[in-house]
Amino acid sequence: MPDLADLFPGFGSEWINTSSGRIFARVGGDGPPLLLLHGFPQTHVMWHRVAPKLAERFKVIVADLPGYGWSDMPESDEQHTPYTKRAMAKQLIEAMEQLGHVHFALAGHDRGARVSYRLALDSPGRLSKLAVLDILPTYEYWQRMNRAYALKIYHWSFLAQPAPLPENLLGGDPDFYVKAKLASWTRAGDLSAFDPRAVEHYRIAFADPMRRHVMCEDYRAGAYADFEHDKIDVEAGNKIPVPMLALWGASGIAQSAATPLDVWRKWASDVQGAPIESGHFLPEEAPDQTAEALVRFFSAAP
């Protein structure tokens, strides 16, 4: 994949060793540490329009999720354990410790947001604040899977099918699939919101059969272990205790299932939120508005 360092001016590259393999990250800026996590079918590059603005106030760590982008791919098992959001969160905590950050702020989009809220539920003492972009909790998505929503996020069921069914089908035309997925979730319904260099980065990553397998394992974990972890928390009345911001696209995925802020109030003790004039990909479709909201939230006194 192309390096694309020019999309992250002032950032350096880090390969961070953990007990489950290396995590790739770009690190830039000075100030309190802020970890940014991407989603499917992307890499850390999706933050390129927002990270430099955040780096004016924070030390920003933009990481590839375990198995995605340039991060190592932990070997999976029948329970998809390394790709549960719980396991991913633990590995990213370890990576942050390696960088010297035991306590940090966290923002995640899509799958990265699922890792983020799981980290907040399992290890709240690690976080100062949490932001999630264009998601509802995994449990809520599955519980709200009516006809309209099942058609909109069909990939949740498709990618969760037993291996190698989705892997083999995706291998028929991976370039078409990844570009179609990106375009279909934007407000405009095309690729015009993306930097072409970023799209090429996502395309090359998705072209790797092993990376596609990891993405399927991510969704298999979401359909089984992640759902059960969420179910235990919601039934026990456990809530995210740290200050939380929920942002969603006015034309995004989360708002089409429910009113996001109402849902998150069931899951978090101190949550605020608002829509962004965007589709699903807030940091690329509406970077100024997204960056402004994140800076305001993370800069405010607790």
Curated annotation (Swiss-Prot):
EC number assigned by the record: 3.8.1.3
Swiss-Prot/TrEMBL keywords: Hydrolase
One of the record's GO molecular function terms: haloacetate dehalogenase activity
Outcome recorded upon mutating D110N: Loss of enzyme activity
UniProt keyword Hydrolase present: yes
Keyword NADP: no
Subunit structure: Homodimer.
Name this protein carries in UniProt: Fluoroacetate dehalogenase
Protein's organism: Rhodopseudomonas palustris (strain ATCC BAA-98 / CGA009)
